[in-house]
Each structure stands twice: as structure tokens, then as C-alpha cells.
């Protein structure tokens, strides 16, 4: 009799995705981040669900409801900090996952890549709205500053901002709708993840060499299930260390002050994972230009398959491209640092140079270096 996992309509899908899936024999730990992102999403949905049971999305009670969760709800403090720091782990895994895709040329699977970009936008939107919910000073002013950027859109800008706010400023209506969107978006993200995997399984995984590996495949289970389990263990250990020893390390002290529309914090800045994009936004003196640069800082990833000029897929055997890739990584660290600094000399000029270098590397230097490497192949 045939095994039920190979015949049952539902089990068959799971079997083809997680058990009998043919996988390349040489994929490294950089391929662990996809499953780690799935784990992060699961942690965020579960902890978020329990937080939503106790949270109230009203300007008068939101801040105290979060305090109540931490003080009075059984294990509320760990649920709250798992959720807050889980977001940081989510973005660490996201950045590493995207970086892996760029380094090893995974973006040539353009459908999978484009769904991935949509996922990145969706996760960023979710994280932004989640940051508004505790209704601290940085929540309120972050929401005010970022939503206000839409007013830069010609003709419809002001109306659009007021429509999103549900009034003439960030207030009760804004908080309520942000809570509603923050609740629904993770489920939309889950659906997009399934589409992402559907497209990935149409082609199969890439591998570090970038060479087609159809001749040498191994079953996903047990080889990669155990490898993923090790990744899970390491990531949960890191997350729990952060939550139990220094839960506020990555947060902003201003968010422990209840929101006050009459008192602006001296430095308005988002969470650390948005600082690179915030630095790019601030580096352009024009409001509309800044907003466009902000969107393009992520949307530029969609141009990656079009800008691939190399005859090789992966950067594994391309030293010039490797050097430029690591310069790009260093540039992103620089932008992250600048995003957290005040707008004054010398940070302004450093931010402008780093922002220029970011786009110049992706649009000009990396495609050009690939062409040079193509020539070097003939030597």
C-alpha cells in the first residue's frame, strides 16, 4: 500500500514541499534564513495574537494596556518582549536572506524574487504600524512624520494624508485602523509566503556555485530538516538571550513616555531596521525627492535581474563583484549609523555620500564589474 503522505491530497502538497523535495546537495547555512523567516513569522503571529487579547487600540488606554500586559498578565512581559525583539530577529533574517539572494544570483528566479520584494514591503509596513501601537512618544511622532511624507505627492498628497489619518492629525482613528491593518497584514504575508514557495518549487533552489544541480539532488528530509532545526535552535537561543537579558537594548527610551502631541522629542527616529532607508530619505533636501529615494531604496531590488550582466550566476568565482558586494554591505551599515544621528555636520554629508554610493553601486558599478569579469574569462 502506498504511503498516505504520497496519496492524500493535502499531505501530498506538504510531502512535496517539506519531505520528498529534491534539494541541491551543497546549499550552505545561508539557505537557512528562508525557514528562519517562516519561524519568525510564526512567532510573531502567535505572540501577536496573545497581545491582541489584552491590547486596546484607544489613545487614552493604549499605553496603559501595554503596561498592563507587562505587569498583570501571566507571562505578559515575555510575550510582549518576544514580539518586539522578534521583529528585530525577523529583519536580521530578512536582510541576510536578501543579501544571500544578491550574492549568489538567486534574483534570476524573477517571479520568486519579485514576490520576495512584495513581502519585504509588506513586512516593513506591518512593523511600522506595530511600532505605533504602544502609543509612546516615538510611536506618535514616528507615525506623524512617516505618514506626512505622503503629502509630498503632487495634487492628492494632503487629501491622502488626512484620509489615512482619519482626521486632521494622528489620533484615535489612526491608531484604530493601524491596529486593524497590523492584525490582518501578517495573514496576507503568510499567503504571499505560500506564493513565494510555489514559485521557488517551480524552479528548485539555487546553490552557492550558481550552476544547475539537477544531476545531484538529495531529499529535503532528513538532510535539511535537521539543518533547519539547528538554525531554529540557534535563532531562538539568540532571541531568548535578548529578551531575558536586555529586552530594551534595541528600543527607544522615548517610547516609555506616553504620546504627547504638544511635546516633540529632540530626535525622531524609527527602529534600527529602518534607519538605512531613513538616512536615504533625509539625505535629499527635497521632500518629494526624499520620498522617491526612500521607496527606490527597496524597489531598486526589482531591477537586479535586469542589471545582471555577468555570464556567471553566482559571485562565488567573481572577486571584483565580491569586493563591491561587501562595500555595499559596509555602506548599508554606514547608512544605518547615520540614520540614528542628528541632522548636522558632518553627518549630513556622510549620509549624502553613502546614499549616492548605495545607488551607484547597484546601478553602475556592479553591472560594469560583471562586464569586466566576462572579459577576464577570455584571458
UniProtKB/Swiss-Prot annotation:
Binding site for heme b b566: 97, 196
Pfam families listed in its UniProt record: Cytochrom_B_C, Cytochrome_B
Membrane topology of the entry: Multi-pass membrane protein
Matches recorded under CDD domains: cytochrome_b_C, Cytochrome_b_N
Domain of life: Eukaryota
MF-aspect GO terms: metal ion binding; ubiquinol-cytochrome-c reductase activity
InterPro entries: Cyt_b/b6_C (IPR005798), Cyt_b/b6_C_sf (IPR036150), Cyt_b/b6_N (IPR005797), Cytb/b6-like_sf (IPR027387), Cytochrome_b (IPR030689), Cytochrome_b_C_euk/bac (IPR048260), Cytochrome_b_N_euk/bac (IPR048259), Di-haem_cyt_TM (IPR016174)
SUPFAM superfamilies tied to this protein: a domain/subunit of cytochrome bc1 complex (Ubiquinol-cytochrome c reductase), Transmembrane di-heme cytochromes
Cofactor: heme b
Bound cofactor: record note: Binds 2 heme b groups non-covalently.
UniProt keyword annotation of Electron transport present: yes
Keywords annotated in UniProt: Electron transport, Heme, Iron, Membrane, Metal-binding, Mitochondrion, Mitochondrion inner membrane, Respiratory chain, Transmembrane, Transmembrane helix, Transport, Ubiquinone
Gene Ontology CC terms, in alphabetical order: mitochondrial inner membrane; respiratory chain complex III
Sequence intervals crossing the membrane: 33-53, 77-98, 113-133, 178-198, 226-246, 288-308, 320-340, 347-367
Protein's cellular compartments: Mitochondrion inner membrane
PROSITE patterns named in the record: CYTB_CTER (PS51003), CYTB_NTER (PS51002)
GO process annotations (BP): mitochondrial electron transport, ubiquinol to cytochrome c
Annotated heme b b562 binding sites: 83, 182
Binding annotation for a ubiquinone: 201
Signal sequence annotation: none
Family that this chain belongs to: Belongs to the cytochrome b family.
Miscellaneous comment in the UniProt entry for this protein: Heme 1 (or BL or b562) is low-potential and absorbs at about 562 nm, and heme 2 (or BH or b566) is high-potential and absorbs at about 566 nm.
Quaternary state and interactors: The cytochrome bc1 complex contains 11 subunits: 3 respiratory subunits (MT-CYB, CYC1 and UQCRFS1), 2 core proteins (UQCRC1 and UQCRC2) and 6 low-molecular weight proteins (UQCRH/QCR6, UQCRB/QCR7, UQCRQ/QCR8, UQCR10/QCR9, UQCR11/QCR10 and a cleavage product of UQCRFS1). This cytochrome bc1 complex then forms a dimer.
Function: Component of the ubiquinol-cytochrome c reductase complex (complex III or cytochrome b-c1 complex) that is part of the mitochondrial respiratory chain. The b-c1 complex mediates electron transfer from ubiquinol to cytochrome c. Contributes to the generation of a proton gradient across the mitochondrial membrane that is then used for ATP synthesis.
The protein's name: Cytochrome b
Gene: MT-CYB
Amino acid at each position: 500500500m502506498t504511503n498516505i503522505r504520497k496519496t492524500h491530497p493535502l499531505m501530498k502538497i506538504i510531502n512535496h514541499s517539506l519531505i520528498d523535495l529534491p534539494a541541491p546537495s551543497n546549499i550552505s547555512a545561508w539557505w537557512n534564513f528562508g525557514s528562519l523567516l517562516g519561524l519568525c513569522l510564526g512567532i510573531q503571529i502567535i505572540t501577536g495574537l496573545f497581545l491582541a487579547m489584552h491590547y486596546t487600540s484607544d489613545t487614552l488606554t493604549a499605553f496603559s494596556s501595554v503596561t498592563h500586559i507587562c505587569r498583570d498578565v501571566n507571562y505578559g512581559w515575555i510575550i510582549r518582549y518576544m514580539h518586539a525583539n522578534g521583529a528585530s530577529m525577523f529583519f536580521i533574517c530578512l536582510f541576510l536572506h536578501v543579501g544571500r539572494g544578491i550574492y549568489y544570483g538567486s534574483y534570476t528566479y524573477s517571479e520568486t524574487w519579485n514576490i520576495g520584494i512584495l513581502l519585504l514591503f509588506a513586512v516593513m509596513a506591518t512593523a511600522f504600524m506595530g511600532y505605533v501601537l504602544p502609543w509612546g512618544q516615538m510611536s506618535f511622532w514616528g507615525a506623524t512624520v512617516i505618514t506626512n511624507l505622503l503629502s509630498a505627492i503632487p495634487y492628492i498628497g494632503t487629501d491622502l494624508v488626512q484620509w489615512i489619518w482619519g482626521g486632521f492629525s494622528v489620533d484615535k482613528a489612526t491608531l484604530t485602523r493601524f491596529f486593524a491593518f497590523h492584525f490582518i497584514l501578517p495573514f496576507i504575508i503568510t499567503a504571499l509566503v505560500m506564493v513565494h514557495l510555489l514559485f521557488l518549487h517551480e524552479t528548485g533552489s539555487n546553490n552557492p556555485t550558481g550552476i544547475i544541480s539537477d544531476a545531484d539532488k538529495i531529499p529535503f528530509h532528513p538532510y535539511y530538516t535537521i539543518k533547519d532545526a539547528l538554525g531554529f535552535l540557534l535563532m531562538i537561543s539568540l532571541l531568548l538571550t535578548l529578551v531575558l537579558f536586555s529586552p530594551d537594548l534595541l528600543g527607544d527610551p522615548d517610547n516609555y513616555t506616553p504620546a504627547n502631541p504638544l511635546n516633540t522629542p529632540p530626535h525622531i527616529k524609527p527602529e534600527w531596521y529602518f534607519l538605512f532607508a531613513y538616512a536615504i530619505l533625509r539625505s535629499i533636501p527635497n521632500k518629494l525627492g526624499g520620498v522617491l529615494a526612500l521607496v527606490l531604496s527597496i524597489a531598486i531590488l526589482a531591477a537586479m535581474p535586469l542589471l545582471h550582466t555577468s555570464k556567471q550566476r553566482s559571485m562565488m568565482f567573481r572577486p571584483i563583484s565580491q569586493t563591491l558586494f561587501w562595500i555595499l554591505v559596509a555602506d548599508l551599515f554606514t547608512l544605518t549609523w547615520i540614520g540614528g544621528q542628528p541632522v548636522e555636520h558632518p553627518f549630513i554629508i556622510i549620509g549624502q555620500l553613502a546614499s549616492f554610493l548605495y545607488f551607484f553601486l547597484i546601478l553602475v558599478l556592479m553591472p560594469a564589474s560583471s562586464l569586466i569579469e566576462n572579459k577576464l574569462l577570455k584571458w
